[in-house]
């Protein structure tokens, strides 16, 4: 599928965010009917979502997403996030620019893993400006990794296993070879920020009538499904769509079943954007 979208146009821009330079990628849509704002996960960057972005752009979405501070081509010490509220504020800056370029179009947030945490908090702060929220393997609810790592005097260097991402070996190989991906240990300020952000989302209330699509693999060992369910059920309001793929691992947008995942997502976009 990736080859079919290999030449999709991409644009870039930068702005000064709350804590430094933020790099943003854009994929213009074909006669855009909606705006999709991608929110990437820990240690990675939006460049890993080119296939997803191209599929969505071909389906009529104007797609864009920032590299969070400390990630990818944005500034800051690598993988250091002092406060996730700042990342949410930066994301809102990107959303405002997208709305200005596409006035009147519905805006949908798609957050993966740590990006799901950021997207959830965004929906709590700025949900009135959203048409829908999509969460893929979201770090919300009962996620024990930060507390476990913080219990050590020195944070252990336990790299993410590429095999935990997808059953497609090419995905793991590309991840391991990507110079913009962080392959070192998690950092204490970021882990502490995770703890605060998880609590903020937990205490921030539900999103009311905002449509929510939750996507998860039942063999996700990085962000186990049961813990996420706690957070999703607390966050979602009256309109939750849940889709779980048997045997799938953490990165559904890079999984062997990604064509099914893309189809589920585009159907949801059609519904929430009134197409």
Residue spans of the language-model regions?
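Active-site glycine-rich loops that stabilize anionic/oxyanionic intermediates
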Residues: 33, 41-44, 218
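Catalytic nucleophile-loop/oxyanion-hole region of alpha/beta-hydrolase
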Residues: 43-45, 72-102
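Short alpha-helix in the alpha/beta-hydrolase fold that links the catalytic acid
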Residues: 224-233
């Amino acid at each position: 599928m990736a080859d079919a979208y290999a030449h999709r146009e991409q644009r870039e821009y930068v702005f000064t965010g709350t804590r430094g330079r933020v790099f943003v990628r854009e994929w213009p849509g074909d006669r855009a009917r909606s705006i999709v704002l991608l929110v990437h996960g820990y240690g990675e960057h939006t460049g890993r979502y080119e296939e997803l972005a191209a599929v969505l752009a071909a389906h009529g979405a104007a797609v864009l997403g920032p590299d969070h501070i400390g990630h990818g081509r944005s500034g800051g010490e690598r993988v250091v996030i002092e406060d996730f509220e700042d990342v949410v504020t930066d994301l809102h800056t990107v959303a405002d620019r997208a709305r200005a370029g596409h006035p009147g179009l519905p805006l949908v947030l798609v957050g993966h893993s740590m990006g799901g945490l950021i997207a959830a908090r965004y929906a709590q702060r700025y949900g009135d400006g959203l048409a829908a929220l999509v969460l893929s393997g979201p770090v919300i609810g009962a996620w024990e990794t930060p507390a476990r790592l913080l219990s050590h005097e020195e944070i252990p260097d336990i790299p993410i296993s590429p095999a935990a991402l997808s059953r497609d070996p090419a995905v793991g190989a590309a991840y391991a070879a990507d110079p913009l991906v962080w392959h070192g240990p998690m950092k204490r300020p970021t882990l502490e920020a995770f703890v605060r952000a998880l609590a903020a989302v937990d205490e921030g209330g539900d999103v009311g009538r905002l449509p929510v699509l939750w996507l998860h693999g039942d063999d996700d060992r990085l962000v186990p499904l049961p813990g996420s369910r706690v957070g999703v059920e607390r966050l979602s309001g009256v309109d939750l769509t849940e889709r779980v793929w048997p045997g799938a691992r953490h990165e559904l947008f890079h999984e062997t079943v990604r064509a099914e995942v893309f189809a589920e997502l585009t159907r949801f976009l059609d519904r929430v954007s009134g197409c």
